[in-house]
Amino acid sequence: MAASVVKTPKCPRRGSAKEQQSKASPKSNNESNNWHWWILLASVFLITFATRFYKVTEPDHICWDETHFGKMGSWYINRTFFFDVHPPLGKMLIGLSGYLTGYNGTFPFEKPGDKYNETAYQGMRYFCTTLGALIMPMGFDTVYDLTRSHEAALLSAAYLIFDVGLLTLNQYILLDPILLFFMMGSVWGMVKISKATASGGSYSVRWWFWLFLTGTMLSCTISVKFVGLFVVLLVGLHTATELWLILGDLGQPIVETLKQIACRAIALILWPILLYTLFFYIHLSVLNRSGNGDGFYSSAFQSRLIGNSLYNASMPRDVAYGSVVTIKNHKTGGGYLHSHFHLYPKGSGARQQQITTYTHKDDNNKWVIKPHNKQRLPKDKLQLLRHGDLVRLEHLVTKRNLHSHSEPAPMTKKHLQVTGYGESGVGDANDVWRVLIVGGKVNETVHTVTSRLMLIHYLQNCALTSSGKQLPKWGFEQQEVSCNLNVRDKYAHWNVEDNEHKLLPSVSFSVYAPGFFARFLESHAVMLQGNAGLKPKEGEVTSRPWQWPINYRGQFFSGSSYRIYLLGNPVIWWSNLVFLALFVAVFLGNAILEQRRAGQARALVRSQADSEDSEPSTTDVPLCTCCPEEQQLLSRPREEHRDPLGAAAWLFVGWLLHYLPFWAMGRVLYFHHYFPALIFNSLLTGVMFHHIIQSLPRWIQHVLLGGLLSLIVYSFALFSPLAYGMSGPLANEPNSTMHSLKWLSTWEF
């Protein structure tokens, strides 16, 4: 019996005459595209630098957070140690740029509005502005690689260039332009790696260059601010997806996947970790002199700082009655037990002297250890302090005793209030505390620095603790001290830091100085705790994440007669939201359509299989020999630079990662925290614009692009005084030149 012949279904070839023509002359098209690309890139560079460097040295006074980061740059130049909640790279670069451009580190940067006068501040502004300006060319090239569309790349770059908010953030001595530069560089490198891999360029010099550049950018981003973790997550997810697709490529051996994993682990994990550690090594090596941030760190950490009382310290190892000591809370970032002449206000417990913790060195941190049942010891008698002893602690300056009673604490109402009580060291039975060494034994001597102590109130049986809560203005925003009836409170541990006693022999404490990795870990613990504990200052304008995408309220950078106001270009921000919504709608619609097509393809395969079962054939025939369209229903190309919707999806993920986490943060938040997410939204807008109009005739595409570009340039011209400076009446006054631009009542310019 003759074998039956199965006819191969023919598929109509698709493609317009225009497409056939473009395939016939790819070289001329590529040359034309290259020229267009270079012309557009040069235009982006010129317009970006022109808008960013215009009036970059104005105003000639401190604006907003320049008071912090300019001051920290000065401390790097002077090698003075300080505490900050952010990693060090951004501030080191600010200090380096100032040093290289003639700034000597002596300007105090006390408060916004202070005139720079003859200070060479310009170099630091130029540096930050240059990095901020480089974001736009990188954004242009990133979108072009994702879409191969000049229109999409140009529109995305224009959305970044003509946003007055991003312009304002780029022109000052701040961490934000540095952070945004490295973040954009990470995304740029991520796309370049994907492009090189897809074109078969794995393991080439170019591929390795982009791999290590991306790892460098990732390390630098998180070394400026911890929010750099969000772009690390984005690149990590993208890399994992690429590796998964490589694993699924049956044309490649499994060894290829393992090689790709190893290469990316080296360049995107190990290399960034090494760089990050190196930045901290430089930071801790440069800042080797004692400063006002010493008290946030442990006593052992401080012993490495030149000028600190513990540096090469020689003091008594043992603690004795009559010792004048400072007592530091042992938790990460803990302060010194402190008092001053001010009383607790009415409604905050007994109106007795305040007891707080304070993170700076001060004579008000000093206490005298006395026996619980005697006022004074004979001057020539030495009695060591031991585990389990009952003592009174007299404040050296105010002569009041550390005291607690059954009144509730001012902030933590479940705790008892701790006060300073008595006169000239004479008080009552509520001044008595039992000293316990954590893990101590009977008659064990209390040692300076190394002994971890608890102070248990004799009558109330509560533990002296630092709750970590910040007191209001009446407490000078210092930390609350209370007495916790739960004596297992982890914040109830203390140590003696400074110890003075003329009868005790002194020993060197250099043996307790920690090495680099111990200080590296402690620095992170202190930074993370400080970041989580950031609270708004009284009268300070803060914001919540829901306000940011809608441009609800801005933020003053300079509130003098020369006003600078951080606010997004409303045309750009609100149209960004429109394109964000369009992406979600188109993506969901496309997903539904893809699922329906996949179902049709599976049904077609089952039908073919049933036909073969009923009529056996000796010939295996593909579903379609002239085109793979039915097969592509099950397997479609996933290369972002050929799939605008796939590219937009990754930019949307970037927007989500840089926006949604702020909803869960309890710390104080500000409007400028949204700008990393804004960059992703602006890139997404360009990609979606291209995706929506690409099927239209070219002349209509050009009209739409020209109209949108004209609109955002015009809106930039209207709102540019917000960035370049305003004077005269505020916008809420009818005679103000900005009156007609106050589109929302919450805008305060």
UniProtKB/Swiss-Prot annotation:
Keywords: Developmental protein, Endoplasmic reticulum, Glycoprotein, Glycosyltransferase, Membrane, Repeat, Transferase, Transmembrane, Transmembrane helix. GO terms for cellular component: endoplasmic reticulum; endoplasmic reticulum membrane. The chain crosses the membrane at residues 34-54, 126-146, 173-193, 204-224, 226-246, 266-286, 572-592, 645-665, 669-689, 703-723. It catalyses: a di-trans,poly-cis-dolichyl beta-D-mannosyl phosphate + L-seryl-[protein] = 3-O-(alpha-D-mannosyl)-L-seryl-[protein] + a di-trans,poly-cis-dolichyl phosphate + H(+); a di-trans,poly-cis-dolichyl beta-D-mannosyl phosphate + L-threonyl-[protein] = 3-O-(alpha-D-mannosyl)-L-threonyl-[protein] + a di-trans,poly-cis-dolichyl phosphate + H(+). PROSITE patterns: MIR. It is found in: Endoplasmic reticulum membrane. Pathway: Protein modification; protein glycosylation. It is a multi-pass membrane protein. Residues 1-30 are annotated as: Disordered. GO terms for molecular function: dolichyl-phosphate-mannose-protein mannosyltransferase activity. Pfam families: MIR, PMT, PMT_4TMC. GO terms for biological process: muscle organ development. SMART domains: MIR. Residues 316-372, 382-438, 443-499 form the MIR domain. Its EC number is 2.4.1.109. Glycans are attached at N78, N104, N117, N288, N312, N443, N735. Interacts with Rt/POMT1. Rt/POMT1 and tw/POMT2 function as a protein O-mannosyltransferase in association with each other to generate and maintain normal muscle development. Belongs to the glycosyltransferase 39 family. This is Protein O-mannosyl-transferase 2. It comes from Drosophila pseudoobscura pseudoobscura. The lineage of its organism: Eukaryota, Metazoa, Ecdysozoa, Arthropoda, Hexapoda.
